[in-house]
Amino acid sequence: MYKSLLDKAGLGSITSVRFLGDQQSVFVSKDLLKPIQDVNSLRLSLTDNQTVSKEFQALIVKHLDESHLLQGDKNLVGSEVRIYSLDPSTQWFSATVVHGNPSSKTLQVNCEEIPALKIVDPALIHVEVVHDNFVTCGNSTRIGAVKRKSSENNGSSVSKQAKSCSEVSPSMCPVQSVPTTVCKEILLGCTAATPSSNRQQNTPQAANSPPNIGAKLPQGCHKQSLPEEISSCLNTKSEVLRTKPDVCKAGLLSSKSSQVGAGDLKILSEPKGSCIQPKTNTDQESRLESTPQPVTGLTKECLVTKTSSKAELDNATAPELQKRLEHTASTPDGLSDKPEVEAGVTRLNSCSEKKVGPSDLGSQSQNLKETSVKVDHDSCCTRSSNKTQTPPARKSVLTDPDKLKKLQQSGEAFVQDDSCVNIVAQLPKCRECRLDSLRKDKDQQKDSPVFCRFFHFRRLQFNKHGVLRVEGFLTPNKYDSEAIGLWLPLTKNVVGTDLDTAKYILANIGDHFCQMVISEKEAMSTIEPHRQVAWKRAVKGVREMCDVCDTTIFNLHWVCPRCGFGVCVDCYRLKRKNCQQGAAYKTFSWIRCVKSQIHEPENLMPTQIIPGKALYDVGDIVHSVRAKWGIKANCPCSNRQFKLFSKPALKEDLKQASLSGEKPSLGTMVQQSSPVLEPAAVCGEAPSKPASNVKPICPANTSPLNWLADLTSGNVNKENKEKQLTMPILKNEIKCLPPLPPLNKSSTVLHTFNSTILTPVSNNNSGFLRNLLNSSTGKTENGLKNTPKILDDIFASLVQNKTSSDLSKRPQGLTIKPSILGFDTPHYWLCDNRLLCLQDPNNKSNWNVFRECWKQGQPVMVSGVHHKLNTELWKPESFRKEFGEQEVDLVNCRTNEIITGATVGDFWDGFEDVPNRLKNEKEKEPMVLKLKDWPPGEDFRDMMPSRFDDLMANIPLPEYTRRDGKLNLASRLPNYFVRPDLGPKMYNAYGLITPEDRKYGTTNLHLDVSDAANVMVYVGIPKGQCEQEEEVLRTIQDGDSDELTIKRFIEGKEKPGALWHIYAAKDTEKIREFLKKVSEEQGQENPADHDPIHDQSWYLDRSLRKRLYQEYGVQGWAIVQFLGDVVFIPAGAPHQVHNLYSCIKVAEDFVSPEHVKHCFWLTQEFRHLSQTHTNHEDKLQVKNVIYHAVKDAVAMLKAVNPVWANVNSSAHWR
């Protein structure tokens, strides 16, 4: 069949091309094309005729593909192609392009059907590129924009604002097809340089989308777009048919007119003809579209730098950086006149007449429409949810005629307050805006301006010809009160905490905070003195992420000034090291810049997010507050060798020193305090001294147990022995720091029982109670260690004066209520007295006992929650009734195969009815299935609000588990940031009952970066299986469960749901080595970017668990989770689950102060996983969480003076 192709001269002629195998031809005469010669008539006709629209789009794509194929373009690498075959039985066969050779214009392909076929010449044999749709980019799939992530605060649903309709006058400019060279440059700068990423959930990728149908135009002229589906306009939705402004006088080219970046302007430099610009209706000019926006504002004063302050500009931007960033667009004759500003456009009242400033973060800015700056109201798109009421959007400074005129006349620099696509086409576009400009699919929505990487970051300026150019970037000293207030410990911002909680949090994570500060200082010290550090202002609802490893960027990072590509400190350091050594950086590939230019480390710009020196000022306040409250500091800052390692001065402050010949370094920098902050204590300051009337009376050899026994007789004083305070250096954090010598200064302090029982973990010698709990009394008969970490035994020895031999005779599971010590918490012990089980989920004292075991890294169980829940909400019938028609993916637990095309109802039908389950194709046997990711993502709260409320109202230990819990550090993250997804998440699966199923796991061995509370809300005993109880009992016994657990099943008649095996986080490396050893024995490979634990590819059955203990000495906790049990799993603890019956479990994640160190380490581990790994992305933002938790804690503590006179002795928080 003949296919008609558009020529390059317009629609005046049609070229028929015959392909191999086609036998029919269809010709279209010129007369039939007359009705669509007029552009506006073409718009209307194509909008109504979707078939013609799709044909045009398909032809353009095919034309582009042919050009790339005939040239052997390397951009086709990874693309699926069809190759014509002369064999009549197989007319086409599929292959994958693995290499392109532009010199020989051939393609190297990989064909499974004909392995011998390696080289294809598209000029000799017909080759077609396979497209799933017109918005895919090779093999890459993109859920969202590469770097930025929207906040869930505005709701989960994202809707596009409806657009009003208006008419446009006829155009006299003919429509021309896109030149191949232009399209190639477009795809080269964005498609080939932008790999896929799954880090965003709201901005789909469209890299191979066809560009606009338009002519080559001289700079300053503008074409008129077709409707929305070809050039993002052939859309069935009722939208405004927009025209483009005549900007010849202003020298401004609207980015909507051209989909090419600044690097592509050379292609458009030759004029092909003149364009007559149509005028838009005045009604359209005055129509303003009201759209909601995220509430994030700058101060009322606008961030504009006047050119009269020449010294300030020179000081803010280094000459080398200025030379690289300035982009002066060449303009043709007649374009140098300054634009005339026409009144009649609504003015902004938020800025004064003398100062022009950007709009609020997240504002919906408008396009420049004409010389009179008419606004294209429909070009804006909001990412806000309809559920959130937000103030009207503030407009860009460029949309105000008066302010625009003043900016052009004065040449003042101002901050970019709109996305790149809404400014001008001459300026380099960031990566997000280049992708946004190429989207053509009607279902894809444009990003809000806040997702532009240069939004409120890049500074712009009009030159003397009235052409907009890049002036530089914001610097750290250009902050305002609102920007700095987000990072300072202000008491007015602290809610949901108290003094005791603040002290406990600071005692646990203060050292980690100091290590973050030292790591930032060390990274800052590597920056050359002559290089200017830029400041990237935090944007509400946007999470800055490394484009290489997907880790959340905390503060210092490196940014490409041309496209906004950003990398974290670790990736930059590794890349630079490999470049110096001549090695290839194989861990992760760096995406390319505009026009496929390589990102070299030396061309990137150091950038910080925290304004000014706030990070270092808060670090000083932390030391001051800890000394003020007697909170011991075991951080490296406590050593005097770091005393001079103070806050680095800003680069502006270093210029004077560099000019005088001095070489500044961190050891010689003068400490400078921010005027916003009070003077802080010097690092290494000793903690506050105890009262002078306190005298230590205990001998040096007093045992911990004897000291604790003295508590009941009133002897509460004890002298601390000299200790060597060491802090493990975090992996990949501060490698360059020298080793820390021990501190030789002794600290004589007093302890109360309350302060000691609640002591956080600092080191191995940190507390008498911890030493007692960690003591070992040998091995039992079966060879397993019996470590009596029993609070009951300790309390009983105090109250009842029992000896250790008497304690061993006490029956297991005996509940003791030592009310004299302040604990009245019903509980018992499982796993041979190694697992605490709390019996009353609503007891107010639970967290006191829980915390002592939790800080040891032990799991904890709470029983009886099902009595508090609304059971009707959690039955399978309710889920089937509400969601039975939803399509989901199922996983076969025996084979790990994914079953698609099923519904939620299919799963619930077999939940308690074995014969009604889905059957496999071969044996026709019922499968053991689990629901995969349902409800999907973060939809639990929105999809099941009543169940969410029921769970949150009854989940135990709310201080930790609720989103606003005072000991849940994730609650300290301000709403300004993207909140981490901490659940709840549902886990629904059938039971594995048969003996053969004991080698399978419902969830294989893995670990999580955060703590978790897993609630068993329903246990379903299926019908149709015999001898279920006997098989379940054997599985429990085979799983190494203790006698008390078995009694719960046999005598207590409780419903067992799942068998857990949990291991201590400290044993992770041993388990990893063991699994690698076993995999090598089985002939399996161990790739560098994969991990046997993170890959969830192993389930440890009885034989493997036995080998693990015998060869590595690793013993875990075997826990049977009954109906109503809540299992608390510490962060970083490897664990696996085997369902005994059909179970419905709900898990809520949280971040506890006790386990932040594991979050730190795991974040570094996840960086080295493959980019397709589910745990690869740093969703927790652990550094941001730590910073703001410490910030709030010191804000609370520095505002209150400790009243030591009200207590008998000073409680020393350690």
Curated annotation (Swiss-Prot):
Keyword Membrane: no
Residues the record lists as binding Fe cation: 1006, 1008, 1135
Tree of life domain: Eukaryota
Subcellular location per the Swiss-Prot or TrEMBL entry: Cytoplasm; Nucleus
GO molecular function, one term: transcription coregulator activity
GO cellular component, one term: nucleus
Zinc finger map (C6-type): 546-571
Basic and acidic residues compositional bias, start-end: 371-380
Alphabetical list of Pfam families matching this protein: JmjC (PF02373), PWWP_KDM3B (PF22988), Tudor_KDM3B (PF22987)
Chain positions covered by the region annotation Disordered: 194-215, 271-293, 310-398
UniProt record, GO biological process: androgen receptor signaling pathway; cellular response to leukemia inhibitory factor; formaldehyde biosynthetic process; hormone-mediated signaling pathway; male gonad development; positive regulation of cold-induced thermogenesis; positive regulation of DNA-templated transcription; positive regulation of gene expression
Main subcellular location of this protein, as a coarse class: cytoplasm
N6-acetyllysine modified-residue sites: 779
Catalysed reaction equations from the record: N(6),N(6)-dimethyl-L-lysyl(9)-[histone H3] + 2 2-oxoglutarate + 2 O2 = L-lysyl(9)-[histone H3] + 2 formaldehyde + 2 succinate + 2 CO2
Phosphoserine found at: 150, 209, 330
PROSITE patterns named among the record's database cross-references: JMJC
Any coiled-coil regions, as ranges: none
Record field: compositional bias (Polar residues): 194-211, 361-370, 381-391
Entry-linked Gene3D superfamilies: Cupin
Comment, domains: The JmjC domain and the C6-type zinc-finger are required for the demethylation activity.
Name this protein carries in UniProt: Lysine-specific demethylase 3A
Source organism (scientific name): Rattus norvegicus (Rat)
